[in-house]
């Protein structure tokens, strides 16, 4: 076990307690980071750029940093989630889709085993951002995949707490925290170190419903927190993507069922239509 998960009494929430030292990876300092890729002053939630645990000799990592900056910028981009085949991943990269999502929650109908993900992720490294989607007790796996340079961004899509998020922030790992639209905070957020993904309420299904929600809720949140990179998910498809962009003005659209022919198999006519909407 890389980290131990303990359940908070009666809350159904989890926190991560580190059970080993962090990976010994040479970090780039904040000043080196800016100079290296001419990073914008505003990154993630408007803070100074953190030190990312990236080996300066690793070309793939350097490319990923630049791609991460673009992904969380004010120009909307596209993340296609629920990728399960190398063929689809390679086609998404060729189309210049910003990011793909690999879902490591075993109960998901778009589940991608670590073995399959290793093949997919290693073949498209540096060509497309690889987002690992984790639910609750998958956190040790997230650390393992980061150590192996198989994912670029961690997406926490369960009942994780700020302690879980902070663990990855402390390692300089970009984090997206998924939040149900009916549980958005209505107050100023005290920590501005991670991005948010607003999704349709799904209970213990943790997303993947293919259903939309009242986008004015997400739009109001973005208006109140303009420096927070906010991704929008939930029932988005080529027919309503333009409306979603107008209503919310997200940093990115996160789409699974709206870009596939069956769970985990992507429909590239839909993908190309979505890309056209974003162009």
Task: For every predicted segment, state its role.
Residues 16-22:
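Residue-level detector of structural "landmarks"
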Residues 9, 29-31, 51, 61-64, ...:
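Serine residues within intrinsically disordered or low-complexity segments
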Residues 26, 35-38, 48, 55, ...:
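Intrinsic-disorder-associated, low-complexity terminal segments enriched in Asp/Asn/His/Tyr and depleted
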Residues 1-9:
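N-terminal helix-forming leader/targeting segments
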Residues 64-252, 257-279:
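Conserved N-terminal beta1-alpha1 strand-loop-helix module at the mouth
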Residues 9, 16, 195-196:
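Short, 15-30-residue, compositionally biased linear elements
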Residues 4, 15-16, 36-40, 44-45, ...:
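Short hydrophobic targeting helices and cationic amphipathic motifs
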């Amino acid at each position: 076990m890389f980290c131990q998960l303990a359940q908070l009494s009666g809350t159904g929430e989890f926190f991560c307690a580190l059970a080993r030292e962090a990976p010994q990876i040479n970090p780039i300092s904040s000043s080196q980071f800016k100079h290296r890729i001419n990073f914008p002053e505003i990154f993630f939630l408007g803070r100074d750029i953190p030190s990312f645990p990236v080996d300066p000799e690793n070309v793939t990592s350097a490319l990923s940093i630049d791609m991460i900056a673009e992904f969380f910028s004010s120009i909307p981009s596209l993340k296609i989630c629920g990728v399960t085949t190398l063929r689809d991943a390679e086609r998404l990269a060729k189309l210049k889709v910003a990011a793909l999502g690999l879902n490591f929650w075993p109960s998901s109908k778009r589940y991608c085993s670590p073995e399959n993900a290793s093949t997919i992720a290693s073949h498209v490294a540096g060509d497309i951002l690889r987002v690992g989607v984790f639910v609750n007790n998958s956190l040790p796996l997230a650390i393992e995949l980061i150590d192996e340079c198989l994912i670029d961004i961690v997406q926490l899509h369960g009942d994780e707490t700020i302690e879980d998020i902070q663990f990855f922030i402390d390692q300089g790992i970009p984090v997206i925290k998924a939040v149900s639209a009916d549980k958005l905070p209505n107050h100023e957020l005290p920590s501005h170190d991670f991005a948010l993904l607003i999704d349709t309420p799904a209970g213990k299904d943790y997303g993947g419903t293919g259903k939309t929600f009242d986008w004015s809720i997400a739009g109001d949140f973005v208006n109140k927190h303009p420096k927070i990179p906010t991704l929008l998910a939930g029932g988005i498809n080529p027919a309503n993507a333009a409306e979603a962009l107008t209503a919310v003005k997200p940093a990115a659209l996160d789409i699974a069922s709206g870009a596939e022919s069956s769970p985990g198999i992507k429909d590239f006519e839909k993908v190309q239509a979505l890309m056209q909407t974003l162009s």
